[in-house]
Each structure stands twice: as structure tokens, then as C-alpha cells.
């Protein structure tokens, strides 16, 4: 039996909104220590990995491991039926063919119950090895989102170049070109605005703008985004939750793709 209760439905809504435009069919694996999910987009360029730890829930019980295959488009429709401030409980038995979503507004004594049919999704769960990265940076997710949105107006590709002292984003398209340069700094009074950079090797990589536009939708989950880059591995973009994370592994574009 699974019973996973969020104190506010808005958290689960934001989690799903953070990656529902990247992938459609997802297996959620529910275990004693929380819920994990993983999916690859149709082009096999982007891998999404989600972990929601027990501490993220107001109440959590999972007596037996269970996999819930869901269509995120359908799930999102049901999530829109609940208010952000409602509590949300996910309920499923040990061999479910559907999942119950229970929204409760304790102030109004209102209870809304919805059932979503589950799917048998044929997808392997990949073991993600710990990778070595050439450069690691952390910056406000709002700033990264603005950079991506602005530069995507000019080109369908965005280049990220990192040196010891600067982080440069470049777009070069048919209508023109643009660049944004930011530098690492630490604000002791407002640490959430700091930009941190650890560089072992310079990085010069290009990514599809449409994928970056999908990735920045995870910004509603966290004030900051962590980015790890390497010429030998997919880039990692990570938004941390109170307990867990939402990760995007994105393969760079090569010269013959640009």
C-alpha cells in the first residue's frame, strides 16, 4: 500500500510541470525511502531523473515497492483540479491498475478524489554513474532562465564557454547574434544571488535551445540551479528539492548538428 501525502499540492504540481514538456510517459518507482522516476525524451538527447525523499512528504508509507506508470499529460489535467494549498495524497495498492489523487481543503472541509488509470510502460531504469566534470557552476535559477529565454530568440543553439574567470553564453542565428557574460562572485549578505564556479578544464559546448527552454521550467522548484559540464559526458542541470532533486542530463550538439 502506498500513501504519500504532500502538505501542499503545489509542490507536486511544480515537480510535474518541471519536466512534463520533456517526456510524456514515466514510471514512478515508489519504495520505502521515497519516490524516484526516470525517463528519456523521444530524441534520446535528454534524460530526466527525479528523486523525492521521504522528508518532502507530510506523511509517507510504502509497504511494498510499486511502479506507477503514468502519462504526464493526463496527470497534469487531474492536478489542475486541485487547489495549490490543498493537501494532496497519492494512494495505490500493491498491484495497482490506477492511482487515487485525494485533494483536501481542511479550512473548507472539502475533499476531492480522482482516479488516474496507470500504464504499462516498457522502459529500463538506467543506473547513472558518478561522472567527472570539467566545470561546475551554481547560479540563481532566475538568472539562468532569463539568459536562456533571451538568447533563444536569436538561435536554436546556445553555446556555453567557461574559462577560469568567466562564464559566457552565446547565440548566433540568422537574424543576429548575442552573448551574456557573467563572473563568479559571493554575496555574503545575499548568498542566494552568488555565482559559484569550479573549473578543472575550460569548457566550450553547444546545446539545443529548445531543450534548455524545457529545462528551465524546473526553476520553480529551486532558487538555484547547479550545472556540470564536460566534453566527455552529457551536461547535468540540477534543481534541488527540500528532500531530493530534479536532474536533466543533456547531450551537447556536435559540429555536424549545428
Curated annotation (Swiss-Prot):
GO biological process: error-free translesion synthesis; establishment of mitotic sister chromatid cohesion; lagging strand elongation; leading strand elongation; maintenance of DNA trinucleotide repeats; meiotic mismatch repair; mismatch repair; mitotic cell cycle
GO function terms (MF aspect): DNA binding; DNA polymerase processivity factor activity; identical protein binding
Post-translational modification: Sumoylated on Lys-164, and to a lesser extent on Lys-127 by the UBC9/SIZ1 complex during S-phase; which impairs ubiquitination and function in DNA repair.
PROSITE patterns noted in UniProt: PCNA_1 (PS01251), PCNA_2 (PS00293)
Gene Ontology cellular component annotations, sorted alphabetically: chromosome, telomeric region; nucleus; PCNA complex; replication fork
Location in the cell: Nucleus
Entry-linked Gene3D superfamilies: DNA Polymerase III, subunit A, domain 2
Listed InterPro entries: DNA_clamp_sf, Pr_cel_nuc_antig, Pr_cel_nuc_antig_C, Pr_cel_nuc_antig_CS, Pr_cel_nuc_antig_N
Pfam families: PCNA_C, PCNA_N
Taxonomic superkingdom: Eukaryota
DNA-binding interval(s): 61-80
Primary location: nucleus
Database matches in CDD domains: PCNA (cd00577)
UniProt subunit comment: Homotrimer. Interacts with RAD30. Interacts with MCM10. Interacts with UBP10.
UniProt family annotation: Belongs to the PCNA family.
Biological function: This protein is an auxiliary protein of DNA polymerase delta and is involved in the control of eukaryotic DNA replication by increasing the polymerase's processibility during elongation of the leading strand. Involved in DNA repair.
Protein known as: Proliferating cell nuclear antigen
Organism of provenance: Saccharomyces cerevisiae (strain ATCC 204508 / S288c)
